[in-house]
């Protein structure tokens, strides 16, 4: 069948996302317990080139690029596109940030309630709610391998927001079509690979992860735009 028959929430997308989420949990358990990924299954199999968690993030961003582009091109409503995206991101993000700050923090912190709420880092953590990654809560998980770190996976939120913005700009510039997408795809991949190579050599793993996530999102965009030429057996 042709890929244009893709329905978004059918085709086992939900199940695939569940598997990816499980892979993230399993993958993160290794560095949280051992302090590094040396014993993580995929990390060992690929000689340190990938982890289950990283591949799972690629899957999430791929489907995000696919579904977001589908939504934008079908509705063709630029004015509400970004607002609709924020409506999907903000409620769960704010729930996690608020619960972590005002419920989890006071319960598990080694500091007293007064010390906890008088610490500036407690309030800085709320910046996660506006897509500024701050991972530390004072006195929380101090004896862990990564002390004070809470919800480290929230780094993906601003990256996804940037991807939404790029998708919208490409739509406004009329780049999301079968004629322009292949050349644009080649150029984007070359630029992203060059950036990844530079930062990989500098050992900036977070930047590399963000760049590869963006590449996955763009791949999802590309697949949807070129859906009429893609056959699935």
Question: How should each PLM-predicted stretch be described?
Answer:
Residues 1-9:
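Short, Lys/Arg-rich, polar N-terminal cytosolic tail immediately upstream
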Residues 2-3, 68-85:
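Membrane-helix interface linkers and caps
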Residues 11-72, 90-93, 97:
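Functionally critical transmembrane alpha-helices in membrane proteins and complexes, commonly lining
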Residues 13, 77-81, 89, 156:
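Alpha-helical transmembrane segments and their helix-entry boundary regions
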Residues 21, 54-73, 156-176, 185-233:
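Specific transmembrane alpha-helix
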Residues 36, 40, 74-75, 105-116, ...:
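Transmembrane helix-loop junctions in multipass membrane proteins, especially transporters and channels
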Residues 44-52, 94-161, 165:
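Membrane-interface helix-loop-helix regions
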Residues 83-96, 171:
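Alpha-helical transmembrane segments of multi-pass membrane proteins
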């Amino acid at each position: 069948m042709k890929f244009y028959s893709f329905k978004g929430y059918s085709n086992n997308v939900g199940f695939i996302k569940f598997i990816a989420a499980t892979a993230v949990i399993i993958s993160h358990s290794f560095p949280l317990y051992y302090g590094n990924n040396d014993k993580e299954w995929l990390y060992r199999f690929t000689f340190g080139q990938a982890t289950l968690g990283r591949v799972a993030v690629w899957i999430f961003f791929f489907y995000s690029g696919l579904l977001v582009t589908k939504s934008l091109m079908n509705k063709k409503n630029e004015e509400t596109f970004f607002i609709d995206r924020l409506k999907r991101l903000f409620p769960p993000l704010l729930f996690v940030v608020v619960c972590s700050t005002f419920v989890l923090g006071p319960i598990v912190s080694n500091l007293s309630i007064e010390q906890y709420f008088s610490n500036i880092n407690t309030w800085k953590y709320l910046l996660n709610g506006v897509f500024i990654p701050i991972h530390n809560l004072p006195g929380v998980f101090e004896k862990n391998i990564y002390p004070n770190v809470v919800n480290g996976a929230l780094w993906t939120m601003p990256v996804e927001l940037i991807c939404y913005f790029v998708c919208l700009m490409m739509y406004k510039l009329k780049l999301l079509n079968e004629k322009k997408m292949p050349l644009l795809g080649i150029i984007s991949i070359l630029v992203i690979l060059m950036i990844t190579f530079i930062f990989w050599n500098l050992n900036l793993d977070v930047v590399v992860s963000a760049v590869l996530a963006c590449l996955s999102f763009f791949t999802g965009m590309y697949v949807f735009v070129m859906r009429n030429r893609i056959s699935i057996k």
